[in-house]
Amino acid sequence: MKLDAPFNLDPNVKVRTRFAPSPTGYLHVGGARTALYSWLYAKHNNGEFVLRIEDTDLERSTPEATAAIIEGMEWLNLPWEHGPYYQTKRFDRYNQVIDEMIEQGLAYRCYCTKEHLEELRHTQEQNKEKPRYDRHCLHDHNHSPDEPHVVRFKNPTEGSVVFDDAVRGRIEISNSELDDLIIRRTDGSPTYNFCVVVDDWDMGITHVVRGEDHINNTPRQINILKAIGAPIPTYAHVSMINGDDGQKLSKRHGAVSVMQYRDDGYLPEALINYLVRLGWGHGDQEIFSREEMINYFELDHVSKSASAFNTEKLQWLNQHYIRELPPEYVAKHLEWHYKDQGIDTSNGPALTDIVSMLAERCKTLKEMARSSRYFFEEFETFDEAAAKKHFKGNAAEALTKVKEKLTALSSWDLHSTHEAIEQTAAELEVGMGKVGMPLRVAVTGSGQSPSMDVTLVGIGRDRVLARIQRAIDFIHAQNA
C-alpha cells in the first residue's frame, strides 16, 4: 500500500505531532492540555504540529463545535503548521485502503445480522466467555459484495501487542483480548479507529499524545498499522484531570470549556501556564514563559497520576500575568470584557491606565471591567452599605469643602487633586479618611477604588464635580 500524504512530508522533520479533537462539543481543558503537550513536544524538537478534526461521528459533529475548537486553539496561541484536516473529506482515501486490505486478505466482509451477533454475545456470556466475534464470515464466500455488510479487520490471534508508552512505560496486551474490529460500517462509512490509523500514516505523525482513555484503542491501531506496513508512532497517554474532590472534572466543578475561561476573565498565558503544570513539572518552578515551556518540556516528565484542578491557583497565576504582562497587551484582552458587559469606553481613561490602576486589585479581567464601570458611565445608585457607613456626620460638609477646592484647581493631575483632599482634611481638622471615603463613595458609587488622586484623574474633572454635587444632594435628602 502507498502513502497518500495531504501535505509535503519534509524528511528533515524528525518529530510531527497532532491534536485530533472530535467536534461534538467545546474545547475542554483536558483537550487543551493534550493539545498543549503535543504542541510543546513538537516545538521542543523543532518539529511540526498538525490539527486534525475527527468528525466521522456525523450525527454528533457540528460546524459550531469545530469553530469553537479552532477559536479555542487560536485564543491559546497554539498555531499549527498543517491543517485543519477533516476526516469527512478523506472518506475516499480510507475506503481505498480498506478495499486494498480486503484484496490482500487483511480484512473481510461480514454479513452477520444484528440478531445473529446478539445471539452470539448471549451464548458467550452464558458460557462466561469474553464477548467477541466468532469469524463466521471470514471464509464465507456465498454472499455478494452488494449485500449489506460491514468490513472487519483480521486481527492477529497469536502473540501480543507491546509498546513503550512515553509516559507510562511498557504496555502489553494479548491479541486474544482483541476482536476483529469493524473498520467500515454498513452505510459505507469508515470507523474512528481505522481513520486515525490512516491519517497518522499519511500525515507522518511520529508521536501521538492523547488521553489515557485511548489506551485500549492503541493495540488495535498498532495491529492495523503493522498490517498495512506503516511505521508505528510513539504513544504518550496522559492522565485525566479531576476536580478538587478527586472526581473527573465536569461542569459541576465550574468552567470546563477553554472559552468559558476567556469569558470569566482569564488571560491565555495564565491558563496555558496552569495547564502545563497540571501533570508536568520542572523542579519547583511554577511560572513559565512560553520559551521556557518549549525548552524544558519532555514527555518522560509527565506524571502518570491524575491531576486535580485548583481554581485558586489559576486565579493566582492570572493576577500574576495581569500585573506582569505589558498593559497594552492586557488592555486588548480587557476590551473584550467591556464590550461583553455593554460598557462604552469611548469616554474615559485609556484602558492601559485602567490596567495600571487595577492590576493589584483584580484577579480577573471580568472583575476589572465590572469594577471600573464608573470610569466610563454614570451609576444609578450609591452602594447602600458604603453610603450608610460614609455618608454620615460631617460628610456633606467635607464633600462641599473638597468640591470647592477641586473646582478651583488650575491643573487636574495627581499632585493637585491629592493636595486638595489633604487641605480639606487639614482645614476640617479630621483625618484623610473622613474626606477621602465620602469622596470615594460620591465619585465611584462604592467604597472601593484605587487611590483617590488616581481615581479622580481617571474619571475626569466634570464628572467628578457633578458626582460630588449629586452625593451632597443625596445626603441632604436623606437627612431631611
Swiss-Prot record:
Tell me how the cofactor is bound.
Answer: Binds 1 zinc ion per subunit.
Sequence motif 'HIGH' region, location on chain = 21-31
Residues binding ATP, per UniProt:
251
Cofactors needed by this protein, per the record, are:
Zn(2+)
Signal peptide as annotated in the record: none
Q: Where is this motif: 'KMSKS' region?
A: 248-252
- Which of UniProt's keywords are assigned here? Aminoacyl-tRNA synthetase, ATP-binding, Cytoplasm, Ligase, Metal-binding, Nucleotide-binding, Protein biosynthesis, Zinc
How does the record describe its quaternary structure? Monomer.
The entry's family comment says: Belongs to the class-I aminoacyl-tRNA synthetase family. Glutamate--tRNA ligase type 1 subfamily.
Annotated NCBIfam families: gltX_bact (TIGR00464)
UniProt-recorded name of the protein: Glutamate--tRNA ligase
Provenance organism: Haemophilus influenzae (strain PittEE)
